[in-house]
Amino acid sequence: MGRQGLIHIVILQYKLGGIYPMKAVDIRQMYLEFFKEKGHHHEPSAPLVPINDPSLLWINSGVATLKPYFDGRVIPDNPRITNAQKSIRTNDIENVGKTARHHTFFEMLGNFSIGDYFKKEAIHYAWEFLTDKKWMGFDPELLSITIHPEDQEAYDVWHQEIGIPEERLIRLEGNFWDIGEGPSGPNSEIFYDRGVEYGSDENDPEMYPGGENERYLEIWNLVFSQFNHNPDGTYTPLPKQNIDTGMGLERIVSVVQNVPTNFDTDLFMPIIEKIEEFANRKYKRPSEVDLNEIFGSEEDINTPFKVIADHIRTVAFAIGDGALPSNEGRGYVLRRLLRRAVRYAKQIGIEKPFMFELVPTVGKIMEDFYPEVTEKCEFIQRVIKNEEIRFHETLDGGLAIFNEVAESQKAAGHDFIPGADAFRLYDTYGFPIELTEEYAEEVGMKVDHEGFETAMEEQRERARAARQDVDSMQVQNEVLANLTVASEFVGFDTLVANTEIAAMIVNGQVEKVASEGQEALVILAKTPFYAEMGGQIADSGIISNDSFTAVVKDVQKAPNGQPLHTVIVESGEMHVEDAVQAIVHRDDRNLIIKNHTATHIMQRALKDVLGDHVNQAGSYVGPDRLRFDFSHFGQVTKEELQQIERIVNEKVWDDIEVVIEEMAIDQAKAKGAMALFGEKYGDVVRVVSIGDYSIELCGGIHVKRSSEIGFFKIVSEGGIGAGTRRIEAVTGKVAYEVVKEEEALLNDAAALLKANPKDIVTKVQALQGDYKELQRDNEALSQKIANAHSWGNCRCSTNNWRCHSSFYKSRSKDNNLLRQMMDDLKALMPKAVIVLGAVDGDLSDAMCRGITIINRWQLPCWKYREIWCQKLVVVIGGVRPDMAMAGAKDASKLDEALLSVYDYVKSI
């Protein structure tokens, strides 16, 4: 049996007596099940918007969410991890739709070892999954391997243990994974031979696994993380070697379903079929297209369908995970993707908003593993539809910019559109270079392609530099990672603990003693101090005995989970194994727990008032206030804030019991517990219930009953970024003090207005009415004075060559009055040069108008303004063919400026 026949048998399964290609959902599940059988913990996919990682714009790989494990900041419960992680990358956006496999949204299947197994096991696992008939069942002869030239260990495993012949083991210098500081190492890539129909030219220097060709498709990358890339550029062996692998789901599905591109798989085709309902033509199926047409680098007849299908997946999932379109950051990425998709939609006859109607299809394809798009479908659709409508306006604005640039270039004697402007139209307004070329051709111009490519490459360089900066992991800290002494947190029940010092780090090294004035990191055998987590700040307090006193400045979680106290030794010497007393500051703790419980109630109230799309985007819970960042598309009205505040206070006054329980994660979810979006949880979780109103997974500390909060007061609310808003509030004593401060301000205002506090609004409204009436009287009087002076001055006009010239200076402060005077004088003298000057303190303003001279000679108004400006240090104002304005700070030369225009009129 030939290779092609074997491939078809491998990728087909039997179902109800029929044969069908394995679906993407089956392949994803099969991968995860395989590694769970190998003892791996399945880590759920994190949201695309990074949580607690400001270095990343998007989650862009399977390993991105595991960085704390790889750099040693956190020790996982199970060192073997597997995941299917949704990811976004937009560095090659211009290639999406033109190639078979470029995407902005994709899924990465991965298996990871944090200091457990290494190369041998990773290679054997990969080979078993790909070739065993129980799993993928690929023909081993269709698989080739690339390795780093110096990675003899990997070569020996592949060649001697797996049995890969030398001709299918290719050594490549590029097989080394390194993104800057942090873990790095060689890698092995596995390639699948798709057959001679995808390439058979023996003279093609790129026709080999790892070359630029379509025949040999990379399906899996195994990274052997064995070095630390240090800040000084050197490499040292990692304390613990790691495994990081990645298999693109879209790629492996295209192989299994035997289709030429990722877009022809069941991950994309339902979306493409939905697009066809709106388009004026159909997508060309693989049987209708020659492979040479598919695998070019240029656009083909299917490009618009591919672009739209890819981009709607990205945008729908990103919005579902909390991102919103904007002009900056990740919001700008979404806006750019939507613009690009809508622009391509026009090529297939779609002229109206339609992208939002694709969202249910995206959700349906992915809902078995990613239910969030379906769950938030209505909200996602609303956001996308609004953005589509706005884009059509943006497109018109881009055309206006093009016209301005074209006119400016022609006026300067040029016949081309500068590359920088063409790139601005491309990058900001979504104009493809081809569209700009078409517009340029219509007005007899060309486009500076070299300048455009230069600007494009500069952007790519900035993106590459940014990726190198944001992807790097921290260098592993071996000292902290090796601290495995036990520490028990007892702070849920007490603020004081008699304990002992279990371990100590001074100046980055494990020590036995810390002296007066030194800072140390301390682990206690048991501690009442809460380590900062979930927005709740760390406790402060004292650790002491008869020999020393140390102030606790901060408490964080060590890599192995123990509370790690940062302390300053104020007096004496602190020794490991000292018996000590640890005391938390009671007043601060009491204020913190009131704010924490209030935050839970407020989050539920936000969802009730604004909608279930509200998700936590950040928080701070301290003794002074609570701060809560949340996702929301639009403003929060005054009435909504009042409603939220009222709901929280009602729950406070209801004196609800706060119940804290530990239970299985599935039980908590069944109970309706709200989880922090994107947070990782173990099999057993802590559930905080405030009656049946608020149920959340939370490891923080809370009041016993809601009435202990006392009083809740919102002090501010506003936007802090695209689609993200922030509420700050206070509780208890602090809330009372805020109210008293506002009351004092109200009383001061009432005293100034000579009114009772309850009558302030009425008093201010009356004053505003009086002020508006005075304004109207003042404007009417000013107009009368100006008119009187105007008519008087007109009788002193100069007649020169049948052209009247009128000059006038007043003390009007209002440009509108000058314009009104100009209109009146224009009606009186239709063939006149009129110059008006107004003085306001040390400022002067002028308006001039040029009209027909000798019935056939028309002078533009800017010429008169030019004469005027020669006499004054001016700030140029607006200009029209029949009117111009200018302003100056020195009013002393106003008379001279007026006369200079008069002299010019006489001279012509």
UniProtKB/Swiss-Prot annotation:
Database matches in CDD domains: AlaRS_core (cd00673)
Protein name: Alanine--tRNA ligase
Record-linked SUPFAM superfamilies: Class II aaRS and biotin synthetases, Putative anticodon-binding domain of alanyl-tRNA synthetase (AlaRS), ThrRS/AlaRS common domain, Translation proteins
Cofactor: Zn(2+)
PANTHER family reported in the protein's UniProt record: ALANINE--TRNA LIGASE, CYTOPLASMIC (PTHR11777:SF9), ALANYL-TRNA SYNTHETASE (PTHR11777)
Designated gene of the protein: alaS
Binding positions for Zn(2+) per the UniProt entry: H596, H600, C698, H702
Job description of the protein: Catalyzes the attachment of alanine to tRNA(Ala) in a two-step reaction: alanine is first activated by ATP to form Ala-AMP and then transferred to the acceptor end of tRNA(Ala). Also edits incorrectly charged Ser-tRNA(Ala) and Gly-tRNA(Ala) via its editing domain.
Any one biological process term the GO annotation gives: alanyl-tRNA aminoacylation
Enzymatic reactions: tRNA(Ala) + L-alanine + ATP = L-alanyl-tRNA(Ala) + AMP + diphosphate
Cofactor binding comment, as recorded: Binds 1 zinc ion per subunit.
Pfam families, alphabetized: tRNA-synt_2c, tRNA_SAD
Highest taxon, organism lineage: Bacteria
Entry's Gene Ontology molecular function annotations: alanine-tRNA ligase activity; aminoacyl-tRNA deacylase activity; ATP binding; catalytic activity, acting on a protein; transferase activity; tRNA binding; zinc ion binding
Family stated for the protein in its record: Belongs to the class-II aminoacyl-tRNA synthetase family.
The protein's Enzyme Commission number: 6.1.1.7
Keyword set includes Aminoacyl-tRNA synthetase: yes
GO CC terms of this entry: cytosol
Presence of the UniProt keyword Protease in the record: no
Localisation per UniProt entry: Cytoplasm
Domain notes: Consists of three domains; the N-terminal catalytic domain, the editing domain and the C-terminal C-Ala domain. The editing domain removes incorrectly charged amino acids, while the C-Ala domain, along with tRNA(Ala), serves as a bridge to cooperatively bring together the editing and aminoacylation centers thus stimulating deacylation of misacylated tRNAs.
The entry's keywords: Aminoacyl-tRNA synthetase, ATP-binding, Cytoplasm, Ligase, Metal-binding, Nucleotide-binding, Protein biosynthesis, RNA-binding, tRNA-binding, Zinc
Organism: Lysinibacillus sphaericus (strain C3-41)
PROSITE patterns linked to this entry: AA_TRNA_LIGASE_II_ALA
